[in-house]
Amino acid sequence: MREFFKKYDFLVLPVSQVAPFSIDQEYPAEINGIKMNTYIDWQKSAYHISAMGNPAISVPAGFTSDHLPVGVQIVGRHRDDFGILQLAYAFEQKTQFAQRRPPICSK
């Protein structure tokens, strides 16, 4: 991470590796052909960032074609909490995703 942040100010990535899934499903059994053995396995994109100790924030980023919410995670350099808050605010102001609501429907 240190090498990455020598060149870049932020890392922006999906909050999770999959879209929201059915409440009846404990966790995705497979993602892109890779078996998920535990509940934590499917959350690796968020889990590894948290373990690094870098400041991170999640912000709304729209909806899937099924109208389920998705988000992006903004990660900053060590101790740059204010920087990620500024970028998150700018993203929300520009996209207005936080103001959007999906149509209420059931499939």
Enumerate the predicted regions with their spans.
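Structural helix-boundary/capping segments
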Residues: 50-107
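Serine-dependent amide/ester hydrolase catalytic core
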Residues: 1-51, 102-106
